[in-house]
A protein has these predicted regions:
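C-terminal PAP-associated
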Residues: 26-531
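Exposed beta-strand and adjacent loop surfaces of beta-rich binding modules
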Residues: 138-140, 197, 255, 313, ...
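Residue-level signal for well-ordered, solvent-exposed loop/turn and beta-edge residues enriched
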Residues: 149, 181-182, 407, 569, ...
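Exposed aromatic-hydrophobic patches
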Residues: 579, 649-651, 818-824
Length: 849
């Protein structure tokens, strides 16, 4: 059967048209409407996965950065008619510190879902059920078992596709409702489009691989606004989703909407009954609804960061939802103020947080409210702050505890007053013991972007959390802007309570993946109430050959320690606090077993690459007057040459020893290059004697007069040190003598030689007559010489290149010599025939046809 037909028959798809009724008017600037969803569909997750696998969706990058980017929320003062004042005064470096107690390590940690190069930021979210884990990102949706094994993965678009008209979904968030054992999932769809919608999905059971009800609502019938950044909460009667609206033209913040869904309706296969509140009098938005872990209060709370500096005070607002499931009532805001102030973002809301190895910063967004939870009648809230107010140099996580009236009971900031460590994108959970886990992103110039958390026990000193615990260190540098201007991270994370015990915690955080410029996500399961083997390292990022000191941090006194160090020397140890050397680059797991209990940390030690030590020299000879270029083999990094230069390549003109101190792009590993010795040799002194004029028909001249001996001659008519005047032709010619020293340095001298008919062809008084007939000849010639003295006669035939091609000696000592010579074996051409008496010679030109 066609798989698409099977899918359609199984899902029982149907639609419902929105119906709105006007509710009673509330405060000015707030309207409310009641209605039902525009579209509802029933789906099965595994069948969605089956259809997606069949259709093989495109992996072409979505690049949310183009249409859907981080929207800046303008500052606006809150209503000051009903103000709750923070009683704790101003922060100081002393009261901003942690309790000084170590946060517990995780009992388990593993990978969630990684970068598929289709979206920045990923918008990290996840939730935990009794048997499953779900991860929802801008890219994909994944279901895992509780040990981290992947059960199924689909794209975010595919999950929502049954609603129809879905081309671009974003900003997913997911929760597990422990009251009803259901999964709650919201997203936005179609940014900057007339089809802009809010989406809600609820599972039919605690098993997310099975049935779901999906709902879609068009957020603006006038098609002048679009929706961004939903926040979701729930209690025993409502599922509440808040989102921000922006103008279609210019994307200016206009208002925000709060959809209060009747939980009983959507859980019982209803049409999607909701009440919508639209607030236009506080465009600063991000009114974050509360997540309830018990039924200690019938109200739901909606928290907002109004301003980091409202007349010298930081300002929040609290609204409440009360009433019945079908007729919720939204209260006017209560204003909460503190004498502490903060900036709403880093400079111009751009890249802000540092990372190891590169100057590229990472965007930490703004101070919007991120997460609100309720437990035992206490409201906990977290958001980022940027400090100081004027010219922020760092980011931190500000946390609050309120009573249900908005009175501040605790608050503080997790931050580093020295400005070395940055924290952002917080999320919080509170268990039945009123212990708290706060997860967040951790940044520093000494680490890659990492995932971390801090724990608070209910009996810890007021206004304190325990020390930061980095449970997943980043593994590489990160920069990805898809052609935009911001190196996006976040936009959020999630921290939740385990529904099986209401005591242990889970947090999912983003970290820089092992592949350069990729993000990834990682889960940590934290149980503060059990014996947990744990350890720390004095350095998680080392260079080859460096050592790491490991310290046992287990929360119980163990008697037996068994360490295993992948990539380390030694590879194992039974010491409580061993020292291990890492000699090769890579990302290495460390395992500690204490009394049979195991703690394993993947990629815990990152051994970075040392820079390449080589220096390349160009082919220019080291001779005085030349310039030699030296280039470091390391293609990128920081360079510090022995000359003081800081470029990769330098030019050298003087003798000496040269080297470069190189820092690798990771910013951590440095070493000195190989040394290069350059010795510039002096150029030789070359001279050349003058030449006499020569007849064009004269025999080729062996050139001499160049010093030092052993050089070469060059010029017109010169070959192998012989000058042939007939080849050079009439005129004045330059002869150059070049000498190369043993060091390879050369110098030259030049003189001119004149070829002219004014000079005879070797006139000689001892030879009174010299004839060659016939000339031209077919090869057989008659040679006649008169006036020969009593000496040996040597006759030579020389070609145009000065080579002797025929020779013969005669010992007839008569005054007249006549000889017949056969030269027919020679190739046709022009030659010289020379009669040589030793102390005198005569030459004539000879043509052989």
């Amino acid at each position: 059967m066609n798989i698409n037909l099977l899918f359609k028959r199984t899902l029982l798809l149907f639609s419902v048209i929105s119906v709105f009724t006007q509710a009673d008017a509330q405060e000015a600037g707030v309207t409310s409407l009641q209605g039902i969803a525009d579209v509802k569909k029933e789906v099965n997750f595994m069948q969605i996965a089956l259809v997606e696998a069949y259709n093989k969706p495109s992996t072409k990058p979505i690049q949310f950065i183009g249409n859907k980017k981080a929207r800046e929320i303008p500052e606006m003062d809150a209503d000051l008619s009903n103000v709750k004042m923070d009683p704790f005064g101003k922060y100081t470096d002393a009261n901003r510190t942690s309790s000084g107690i170590a946060s517990p390590g995780p009992i388990n940690n593993f990978n969630g879902l990684n970068d598929n190069s289709t979206s920045i930021p990923p918008d990290v979210n996840g939730a935990v059920g009794p048997n499953h884990i779900m991860v929802t990102l801008n890219t994909q949706v994944r279901i895992q078992d509780r040990s981290g094994a992947t059960l199924s993965t689909v794209t975010l678009n595919s999950f929502w596709a049954p609603l129809g008209g879905i081309t671009s979904t974003y900003d997913p968030k997911i929760l597990y409702d422990h009251f009803s054992n259901r999964w709650l999932f919201c997203s936005s769809a179609e940014p900057q489009s007339n089809s802009s919608s809010t989406l809600l999905a609820v599972s039919k059971t605690s098993d997310p691989t099975q049935g779901w009800n999906l709902y879609k609502i068009d957020v603006d019938a006038t098609n002048t606004k679009w929706v961004d950044y939903p926040s979701i909460g729930f209690n025993d009667r409502w599922i509440t989703v808040q989102m921000n609206l922006f103008s279609m033209a210019g994307s200016t913040a206009t208002s925000h909407q709060i959809y209060v869904w009747d939980k009983a309706d959507v859980y019982n296969n209803g049409a999607g009954v909701f009440t919508k509140f639209e607030i236009t009098n506080e465009s600063t938005a991000i009114v974050c609804p509360s997540i309830h872990y018990d039924n200690s209060t019938s109200k739901m709370f909606l928290m907002r960061v109004a301003s980091g500096n409202s007349s010298g005070k930081g300002t929040l607002t609290m609204r409440t939802l009360s009433g019945t499931a079908t007729t919720p009532v939204l209260s006017a805001p209560t204003t909460i103020q503190t004498n502490n102030t903060w900036a709403s973002s880093g400079a111009n809301n751009t890249n802000f947080a540092p990372q190891l190895g590169v100057t590229s910063l990472i965007a930490t967004n703004d101070h919007r409210m991120r997460h609100v939870v309720v437990r035992d009648g206490k409201v906990w809230a977290v958001h980022s702050v940027f400090l100081p107010l004027s010219g922020a140099t760092r980011s931190g996580v500000q946390w609050w505890q309120f009573d249900t009236l908005g009175n501040v009971q605790q608050r503080n900031i997790i931050e580093d007053p020295t400005g070395q460590r940055f924290y952002s994108f917080p999320s919080i959970a509170v268990n039945k013991k009123n212990d708290v886990l706060l997860g967040y992103a951790s940044f520093a110039p000494t680490q890659y972007a990492s995932g971390a958390y801090s724990f608070r026990k209910s009996t810890d000193p007021i206004n304190t959390f325990r020390d930061e615990y980095v449970f997943k260190y980043g593994e590489n540098t990160y920069f990805k802007d898809f052609g935009g201007t911001r190196n996006r991270w976040g936009d959020y994370t999630n921290t939740v309570i385990d529904p099986t015990n209401d005591s242990t915690f889970w947090t999912i955080q983003e970290y820089a993946g092992s592949v350069i410029n990729t993000w990834a996500t990682w889960w940590a399961h934290v149980n503060p109430y059990t014996d947990i083997p744990d350890f720390s390292a004095d350095n998680n990022y080392v260079c080859p050959g460096e050592s790491v000191v490991f310290t046992n941090k287990s929360n119980f006194s163990g008697s037996s320690f068994q360490w295993t160090f992948a990539g380390g020397t030694p590879a194992s140890s039974t010491d409580a606090n061993p020292t291990v050397t890492y000699n090769t680059s890579g990302r290495f797991r460390v395992t500690l077993v204490v009394d049979g209990k195991t703690q394993l940390k993947d990629g815990y030690v990152v051994t970075l690459a040392n820079p390449v030590r080589g220096i390349n020299k160009n082919n220019v000879l080291p001779c005085e007057g030349n310039t030699i270029t030296l280039t470091a083999s390391q293609a990128s990094g920081v360079y510090s040459w022995s000359t003081g230069a800081t470029t990769r390549a330098i030019q050298v003109t003087q003798s000496g020893t040269y080297y470069c101190d190189i820092t690798a792009p990771n910013g951590l590993c440095s070493r000195r290059s190989d040394s290069v010795v350059i010795t510039f040799a002096p150029a030789p002194t070359v001279t050349l004697a003058d030449f006499n004029a020569i007849n064009p028909n004269a025999t080729p001249l062996q050139l001499t007069g160049g010093t030092p001996a052993g050089g070469t001659y060059a010029g017109p008519g010169v070959s192998n040190g012989v000058f042939t005047p007939s080849v050079a032709g009439l005129g004045t010619h330059t002869i150059t003598y070049t000498f190369v020293s043993p060091e390879g340095c050369s110098a030259s001298a030049s003189k001119t030689i004149e070829v002219t008919n004014a000079v005879g062809v070797n006139a000689n008084t001892k030879i009174t007559a010299f004839s060659v007939t016939p000339n031209p000849s077919k090869g057989l010639i008659n040679l006649s010489i008169t006036g020969v003295s009593n000496s040996n006669l040597k006759v030579q035939v020389i070609d145009q290149l000065g080579r002797i091609v025929w020779t013969k000696n005669y010992d007839d000592y008569s005054q007249n010599i006549k000889k017949e010579i056969d030269l027919s074996s020679l190739p046709k051409g022009a030659y010289f025939i020379k009669a040589d008496l030793g102390e005198a010679s005569e030459t004539q030109k000879l043509i052989i046809e």
